[in-house]
Amino acid sequence: FFNQPIFEKFLRSEAIKHNNIDIKLGYKLTNIDAQESINNLTLLNINNEENEYITSNYVLACDGANSFVRKALNIESFDYKCDQDWVVVDYQVDDKYKINTDRYQICDYKRPTTIVPITGQHVRWEFKVNPDDNLETLEDEKNIRKMMKPHLWRLNPEIPLHSGKLLRSSAYTFHGLLAKNFKFNNCFLLGDAAHQMPPFLGQGLCQGIKDSYNLCWKLSGVMNNIFNKEILNTYSLERKGIVDFVIKGAMKQGDIIGSQDWLTATLRDIYLNVASYIPKLLKPLKFQKPWKIKNGMIDNDLFPNDVNGVIIPHPSLDIKVDNKLFD
């Protein structure tokens, strides 16, 4: 796990080091005309409310769950209909307490809870919202600490209830959505603009990073006249299947954790208790890996085998004493 705000700050600090990157803050995209070979974009300067017009050969839309680009291009999304309301809390433990870094997903039908130590003393808590909760008061510090109380010992039994700092708390509706296509002409959707998933596998940002890894080396090859432009069509083909698999896995995990029906939760608990003695029973509940690319550049007909398209770790190689990544 990593701290997402720190990671995003690092990305921005690295981006400003490159002269070929123009970072425009305080602008809003208000129109996009995505033609077959050129894109015309209108940007609104928030400060002086003046428009700026730019053209580009390619657009990579990383504009989040409410993506303007996705809506403007009329790209529809498939809804997995798995919405759940949760309160997400960032909690900073006092430095004098050493915390247990194990992650917990607590199957308590009265209040399903997730505890994830991220980096340092930073801990992410997630509490499922009950039907009779008042959202206006649920996020109050008093109520947050009340929900933390039964599980705080898991971090360290010595941590007092009112110690530490609540950095933020916010109610979210967890969605499962997948754009029906990640590409329109020379525009591409990446990250939450292309897909949204419940957080139970910690894969939201990770899948966005995988989007960029899949697309950018291909785009670089096309722009440098190394690859035929047709290679860009493989981006959506390769990524959609894997993201669909991850979303379904996260939904399954969420159903296990988040059940608030007494009978269902009781049967689940009995099953898990029995499975603790018969580990094979846990296999259907585990996140199935490896992820496999079944479409796109992989020719499963020409090279039919079990490992074709399987994603492997990204090693580094010593090439003339220069440590470089495999690609």
What kind of region is each of these model predictions?
Residues 48-58:
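Core beta-strand elements of the Rossmann-like FAD/NAD(P) dinucleotide-binding domain
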Residues 2-24, 29:
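Helical element adjacent to the flavin cofactor pocket in flavoenzyme catalytic cores
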Residues 42-46, 92:
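A generic structural motif
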Residues 13, 38, 58-176:
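Conserved FAD-binding catalytic core of PHBH/FMO-like flavoproteins
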Residues 41, 124-125, 189-190:
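Short beta-strand motif preference
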Residues 25-40:
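A conserved short coil-to-beta-strand element within the FAD-binding core of flavoproteins
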Residues 11, 61, 166-253, 320, ...:
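Conserved mid-domain beta->alpha element of the FAD-binding
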